[in-house]
């Protein structure tokens, strides 16, 4: 079988349109509000989205009681909420993950594949330094949210 390998390039608009090229958002919300309101947001780009799963950060975060529509806690293609009472724990998980990742080497990971109509493997280069930078920004966003009495919504 011939397999075509595609290394995802975020600068290529055709690659950004692929369903395997996922992004996300973390929103600062108050679950007790009468109506839904977003107070601030932090975007998760496609590189960091893939890295969060690859390095096990999402899995580590699932030790916390995320509320999700699917019941799968924090997972891809889902929306999940975390109450403010757990934000300090979340920030600690993120800071620990950043510390563990700092010495990792860049690598190319398999995002997914398809068999039909043509066999294609989708790959992505992961730069741990970029991911550490994102985790530090996310941890700061979490700390600021906790200090302001906000809850968090993850749209993955």
Q: Locations of the language-model features?
A:
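Acidic (Asp/Glu-rich) sequence patches and key acidic residues
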Residues: 1-148, 152-156
